[in-house]
Amino acid sequence: MPDNPTGTLPEIILASASPRRRQILSEMGFVFSVCPSQAELYPDGSVAPAEFAVLNAQIKAKDIASKYSNGLIIAADTIVVDDFGILGKPSSKKVALNYLSRLGGKPHTVISSVCLLNAENGQIRSATCQSTLTMRPYTQAEAQRYVDSGLPMDKAGAYGIQDKEFNPAENIQGCYLNVVGLPACTLVRLINEMGFNPKLARNWKPEGDCTLCRIYRTEISRLR
């Protein structure tokens, strides 16, 4: 993290339709517009999961950057990885139930890649964040009710850590916001690396127990 990033943030464009990512950015104090990217890769096993997430985030950022002459594009891609491979967003309720059956009572990895692209000069930065999550041993009936609610259908791995009624997680190691879909610690680090000073909301408190999120929150407050 630079000792004193002084650049003023340009207009921020979020290349995602995710309501969770919008909420995280808003709570952090960022003002931004939303222009979701439809560009997306589908896993075929040809690259490692972390590399796949990076490529997907970069493709989304470049897709939206082509529509703007200036502005800072923020794109992200989140995947769930178990012993058998990548679990993206389920294509059907049957697939969602299969994902939940695979994950129940077991640990898995959540990887989020964040990509920032300055549309004015083409500067680009990417980084990934990984968390390990163990699901609680929910029953098949619980999983079916959750799937029938429709809540998991737009989420990687067919669950949302923030879905309190289903409450899927038993234990989380790493960044909570990474599991939600946008690790604040990774985002702030990338913004700093691009030379900008992110002025975070004074009342923002990162959810979860991520040490890096809390450190960045403290450091940014000190630099204001």
From Swiss-Prot:
InterPro entries recorded for this chain?
ITPase-like_fam, Maf-like
Which Gene Ontology biological process is one annotated for this entry? nucleotide metabolic process
Where in the cell does this protein reside?
Cytoplasm
**Catalytic residues, chain numbering:** D77
Family classification: Belongs to the Maf family. YhdE subfamily.
Q: Which reaction does it catalyse?
A: dTTP + H2O = dTMP + diphosphate + H(+); UTP + H2O = UMP + diphosphate + H(+)
> What is this protein for, i.e. what is its function?
Nucleoside triphosphate pyrophosphatase that hydrolyzes dTTP and UTP. May have a dual role in cell division arrest and in preventing the incorporation of modified nucleotides into cellular nucleic acids.
Provide the top EC class.
hydrolase
* Protein name as catalogued: dTTP/UTP pyrophosphatase
In this chain, the site described as Important for substrate specificity is at R20, T78, Q162
The GO molecular function terms of this record are: dTTP diphosphatase activity; UTP diphosphatase activity
Keywords, in A-Z order = Cytoplasm, Hydrolase, Nucleotide metabolism
Give the organism the record lists.
Dehalococcoides mccartyi (strain CBDB1)
Gene3D superfamilies xref list: 3.90.950.10
The enzyme's E.C. designation: 3.6.1.9
A single cellular component GO annotation: cytoplasm
Main localisation: cytoplasm
Cofactor entry: a divalent metal cation
